[in-house]
Amino acid sequence: MAVKIRLARSGAKKCAYFKIVIANNCSPRDGAFIEKVGHYNPMLPKDNHERVILKTDRIEHWLSHGAQPTEKVINFLQQFSITLPLAIQKKHNIKLKNYVAKPSKKSK
């Protein structure tokens, strides 16, 4: 069973609110989850400390058991200075290198 750390949408229409959950890879986005480990409210200002709340101890537990975070969750984990396993760090760095523009070969 592959486990992911991902966002599950909730809230009213045009007023999104996301739960950060541990869920089975096969379950739907807003479907059943194993554990809620935080929440994200994009409606709050970026400098508000309540915009992203994480249970760091539980996230570290699930990462040590092989849970794979999504790209957005990786960004949140980096904001909270949570160390990721080496395999996830390598995978994330490879994706960042793909977005770097290559210099043009025209020298004239």
Curated annotation (Swiss-Prot):
Under Gene Ontology molecular function, one entry of this record is:
structural constituent of ribosome
GO CC, alphabetical: cytoplasm; small ribosomal subunit
Its GO biological process annotations read: translation
Q: Which UniProt keywords apply?
A: Ribonucleoprotein, Ribosomal protein
Q: Does the keyword Lipid metabolism apply?
A: no
Read off the PANTHER family from this record. Answer: 30S RIBOSOMAL PROTEIN S16 (PTHR12919), SMALL RIBOSOMAL SUBUNIT PROTEIN BS16M (PTHR12919:SF20)
* Name listed for the protein in its UniProt record: Small ribosomal subunit protein bS16
Q: Which organism is it from?
A: Orientia tsutsugamushi (strain Boryong) (Rickettsia tsutsugamushi)
Q: What is the lineage of its organism?
A: Bacteria, Pseudomonadati, Pseudomonadota, Alphaproteobacteria, Rickettsiales
